[in-house]
Structures are given as C-alpha cells and as structure tokens.
A protein has these predicted regions:
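Von Willebrand factor
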Residues: 1-28, 40-42, 60-62
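Von Willebrand factor type A / integrin I
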Residues: 22-26, 38, 44-142
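Acidic beta-strand-to-loop metal/phosphate-binding motif
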Residues: 29-35
Length: 142
C-alpha cells in the first residue's frame, strides 16, 4: 500500500496518480479511492497508470452531496478552500441546479474512466459496499 501524503487539503489526483506510476515499478492492482470531484483533469495520468497497472477507481460520496436535502438555510464549507457560505436548500431551483451539476460531473467522470479503460464503482457512504464490490469483481472475472 502506498502512503501518499498531500501537502495541502486541495485534492490533486493528477499528482497522486503520477506518484503511483513512478513509485510502483512492478505491475500491481491499484485502487484509487476518492470522491473524484477535482478541478484538474487527470485523464492522461489515469490512462498512463492503467497501461502500467490494473487501476480500479472507487468513488465514495455522501448521499447528501448527490441529493441536496430540503432543510432550509444551510451553511456549507468547501473543505479544500475553506470558503463558507449559506445556501437556501428549500429552493427547488437550487436543488434542481445542484442535481444537474451532479449528473454532469458523473457523466464527465464516467467518460474519463471509459476513455482510460479503468473499471470503476460508485459507493455512497452508509451503502452496502460488499455487494457492489462483488458485482464489480464478478464482471471483471468474465
């Protein structure tokens, strides 16, 4: 297991994937666990890593980030930048815009995985991940 220590709270999958490619000299199976909500593209690095190794992407997300709950005013904080703000989750427009954004991000992410030929799985926190992993490995075995 590689122990990649980020220098800041900002997510930089690109650097972490490059680290994997440079450090692991022999072919390995590498699991990348992340929410994959990043600002920089990592498609090229992922493609290179998957040519050298067997890369499996595991997206872990909180269901509340997918389906914004209707709870009125909510204070949110960007974990990477520290920026805080209030949003009105009772706004149908806001929840719809958030849902559209989520779906767009998932489409882009699935496109990256597909073009990089990387097997992937999405798991919500609190969800039974064992069954999803069994299905993934069953598909990989065929």
């Amino acid at each position: 297991m590689l122990d990649f220590k980020p220098k800041s709270q900002r997510t930089d999958l690109k650097t972490a994937i490059e680290f994997l490619t440079k450090v692991m000299k022999r072919h390995c199976t590498a699991f990348i666990l992340s929410d994959f909500f990043v600002r920089k593209s990592f498609k090229d690095e992922l493609t290179i890593a998957n040519r050298k190794h067997d890369v499996i992407a595991v997206q872990i997300y909180d269901q509340r980030t997918k389906d914004l709950p209707d709870v009125g005013l909510m204070k949110i904080k960007d974990a990477e930048t520290g920026h805080e703000m209030f949003i009105d989750t009772s706004s149908y427009r806001l929840r719809e815009a958030h849902n559209e954004y989520w779906l767009k991000q998932q489409t882009l992410l699935n496109d990256i995985f597909s073009k990089s030929n990387v097997d992937n799985i999405s798991i919500a926190t609190g969800e039974d991940f064992v069954m999803k992993l069994m299905i993934l490995f069953s598909k990989r075995g065929q």
